[in-house]
């Protein structure tokens, strides 16, 4: 993925779910997904499409699926090799908070000059707390429609 403008990353609900015993809540029983919540938001597709139509290169990387399918997949090594101007994470549902914020910290470690965006319902609602307590997050795209703000 050399030289893209934006990489949208979908993290598992818990970054190191393969190493730590975790007690998943009842929400994972009603969502058509594993407790890792590997389905990325449909908004990723519309954002990438919109950006591409406006001359930008954008990609989606589903880290959760990569980690589920391959027990030896090294997410940090993969992230280190990414080449993007900007990175974005979804934080729609609160079960994604730990995974998204932990993986954003890994991105910031290897790409300290690249801005990291966060979007989604929970990110919008808790935007002040996130910006105050999680320095790896540079911007939060609030609300439902993020295509136009991405161009700004």
Predicted features along the sequence, with ranges:
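A generic secondary-structure micro-motif detector
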Residues: 36-37, 93
């Amino acid at each position: 993925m050399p030289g893209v403008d934006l990489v949208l990353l979908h993290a598992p609900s818990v970054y190191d779910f393969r190493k730590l015993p975790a007690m998943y809540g009842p929400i994972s029983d009603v969502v058509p997904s594993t407790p890792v919540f590997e389905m990325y938001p449909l908004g990723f597709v519309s954002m990438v499409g919109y950006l591409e139509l406006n001359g930008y290169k954008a990609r989606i990387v589903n880290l959760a699926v990569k980690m589920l399918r391959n027990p030896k997949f090294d997410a940090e090594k993969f992230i280190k090799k990414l080449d993007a101007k900007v990175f974005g994470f979804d934080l729609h549902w609160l079960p994604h908070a730990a995974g998204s914020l932990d993986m954003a910290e890994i991105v910031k470690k290897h790409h300290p000059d690249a801005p990291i965006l966060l979007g989604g319902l929970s990110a919008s609602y808790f935007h002040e707390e996130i910006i105050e307590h999680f320095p790896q997050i540079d911007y939060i795209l609030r609300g439902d429609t993020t295509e136009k703000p991405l161009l700004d």
